[in-house]
Amino acid sequence: MRSKIKLSLIANKTSRRTTFRKRKGGITNKLHELTTLCGVKACAVISSPYENPVVWPSTEGVQEAVSMFMERPATEQSKLMMSHETYLQDKITKETKKLESLRRENRESQLRQFMFDCVEGKMSEHQYGARDLQDLSLYIDHYINQLNSSVMLLTNNGASSSSFPPPLHTSVAGAGAGAGAAPLVVAGAGAAPLAVAGAGASPLAVAGVGAAPLAVAGAGPPMAQNQYEPIQPYIPTAFSDNIQYQAPVDFNHQIQHGIYDNLSLDPNHQYPFQDDPFMEMLMEYPYEQVGYAAEHAHIPFMNGNYYNYHQPPTVGLTTTGHMPSNNATTTTTTNTTVV
């Protein structure tokens, strides 16, 4: 990377002459590019102690350009005229403005720190003069005016803090959580609500005013927490040739073992239908001793093909307790279900 050249007279005569020769060629090349690309009139006269004065592009060209310049009004002639003295004066003015801007920014930063120290009670740590206190007072007034302007702007635009709705106050935990708690309804009509608020708290309405709660599932009996409901496969008999089954699901494990395990772990009768005679019989005797049809109600698959299997109609499932077999001969066994 080339270093910035210092604009001062070169002390060495040989170096000064070499620099003159190089820069003279550069100036003439730039003038040629300017006149060719932009279609303007330009000329240059370079006088030096090393050689005769250099005129570009020619003597006639210089006279023509000078004549066009002299025909201009005096104000236009001196409007963009730049000499060495005016160039230096322009640079000094620009640097002075930059210095004043930096001083103003530093003073504002210092006054801002003074203001925060006053708020925190740290004024005794600094030595303030009369001018500092006066500037601090003016800065605080200016800061307050800016805050008032911002508040008025937000108020006029309708974005004040009073326009926002109040926050929703819901207590998630409390001493009386459970009994009498207002529900958060997530199921259809008739479903047991899920209590998430304290006693007497208002429910969180999801649906419109006067509308039914947000239905996530169909209407059904109440379900307790951590309960497995038996899954009954839907097998239509009229369209058995058009049904394609996906990946297998072990319904026997969910129907047989899941519900009995849950029932066996329930000493406090927290599950529904505990007073039903049939449920008491199931809890008293293992399902191996009862003719439970679901023990054999599994869905057969053909050679492990779970995707393109056409399920035959399930006729007689309620009486036999078996799904129709895919073998050539089907043996029917009647199991007695105790009700």
Swiss-Prot record:
Coiled-coil regions listed in the entry: 86-112
SMART domains per UniProt: MADS
SUPFAM superfamilies: SRF-like (SSF55455)
Keywords of this entry: Coiled coil, DNA-binding, Nucleus, Transcription, Transcription regulation
Subcellular location: Nucleus
Pfam family, one: SRF-TF
Signal sequence bounds: none
Residue ranges constituting the MADS-box domain according to the UniProt record: 1-60
Gene Ontology cellular-component annotations: nucleus
GO molecular function terms attached to this record: cis-regulatory region sequence-specific DNA binding; DNA-binding transcription factor activity; DNA-binding transcription factor activity, RNA polymerase II-specific; protein dimerization activity
UniProt xrefs under InterPro entries: MADS-box/MEF2_TF, SRF-like_MADS-box, TF_MADSbox, TF_MADSbox_sf
BP terms from Gene Ontology: positive regulation of transcription by RNA polymerase II
Keyword Transport: no
Top-level taxon: Eukaryota
Function: Probable transcription factor.
Self-association and partners: Interacts with AGL61/DIANA and AGL62.
Name the UniProt record assigns to this protein: Agamous-like MADS-box protein AGL86
Species in which this protein is naturally found: Arabidopsis thaliana
